[in-house]
């Protein structure tokens, strides 16, 4: 009986202890996470102009948000980094941060949020002027034509009577 008592006591102590036994625990233990400073999340999107807001969300001030697209693929790397990050200028909604003009994102989704329109006006207007010069010439003409075609109503063709 004493031979089985020692292993049983050891297993009991092991079960009731609260240490980190898994590899995914933060350095310094469970309570060390509050001591870490938040870093800025990874850059993403076209030209690295955006920031990750979740594993499949990439937002940029002048581009808006990409959710579940190729532009947001880099954001999946954030899951493998040991330190927490935070993007966005100010808190909004339920646990989100302002991501772009009028858009509030958390790590799972984005919603329109009127309080996120403040602080983006000047940047959005300045970028409108700079983006217009980037599309001068044939590329700009092609893009303009595609937008016009997409917005044009389709021609109405009367239905042909069925012939037997």
Swiss-Prot record:
Record's subcellular location:
Secreted
The answer to whether keyword Secreted applies is yes
| Any one of the GO CC terms | secretory granule
A Pfam family of the record is Hormone_5
Cysteine-cysteine disulfides: 20-25, 41-85, 44-58, 52-75, 59-65, 92-104, 98-116, 105-110
**Signal peptide annotation:** 1-19
Q: Which UniProt keywords apply?
A: Amidation, Cleavage on pair of basic residues, Diabetes insipidus, Disease variant, Disulfide bond, Glycoprotein, Hormone, Host-virus interaction, Secreted, Signal, Vasoactive, Vasoconstrictor
Indicate the family of this protein: Belongs to the vasopressin/oxytocin family.
- The name under which this protein is listed is Vasopressin-neurophysin 2-copeptin
- Quaternary assembly: Interacts with vasopressin receptors V1bR/AVPR1B (Ki=85 pM), V1aR/AVPR1A (Ki=0.6 nM) and V2R/AVPR2 (Ki=4.9 nM). Interacts with oxytocin receptor (OXTR) (Ki=110 nM).
Which residues does the annotation flag as glycosylated?
A: 131
Q: Does the keyword Disulfide bond apply?
A: yes
| UniProt main location, coarse | secreted
Glycine amide modification, residue list: 28
Q: Name one GO biological process term.
A: positive regulation of cell growth
Disease in which the protein is involved: Diabetes insipidus, neurohypophyseal: A disease characterized by persistent thirst, polydipsia and polyuria. Affected individuals are apparently normal at birth, but characteristically develop symptoms of vasopressin deficiency during childhood.
Hey, where's the site called Important for agonist activity on V1aR/AVPR1A on this chain?
A: 28
Note the InterPro entries from the entry.
Neurhyp_horm (IPR000981), Neurhyp_horm_dom_sf (IPR036387), Neurohypophysial_hormone_CS (IPR022423)
Give GO terms: molecular function aspect only.
neurohypophyseal hormone activity; neuropeptide hormone activity; protein kinase activity; signaling receptor binding; V1A vasopressin receptor binding; V1B vasopressin receptor binding
């Amino acid at each position: 009986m004493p031979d089985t008592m020692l292993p049983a006591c050891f297993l009991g102590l092991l079960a009731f202890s609260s240490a980190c036994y898994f590899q995914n625990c933060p350095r310094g233990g469970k309570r060390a996470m509050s001591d870490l400073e938040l870093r800025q999340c990874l850059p993403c999107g076209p030209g690295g102009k955006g920031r990750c807001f979740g594993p499949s969300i990439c937002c940029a001030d002048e581009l808006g948000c990409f959710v579940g697209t190729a532009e947001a693929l880099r954001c999946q790397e954030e899951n493998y980094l040991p330190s927490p990050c935070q993007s966005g200028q100010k808190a909004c909604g339920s646990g989100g941060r302002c991501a772009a003009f009028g858009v509030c994102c958390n790590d799972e989704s984005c919603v329109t949020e009127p309080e996120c329109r403040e602080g983006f006006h000047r940047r959005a207007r300045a970028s409108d002027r700079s983006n217009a010069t980037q599309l001068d010439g044939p590329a700009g003409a092609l893009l303009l034509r595609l937008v016009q075609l997409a917005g044009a109503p389709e021609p109405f063709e009367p239905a042909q009577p069925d012939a037997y």
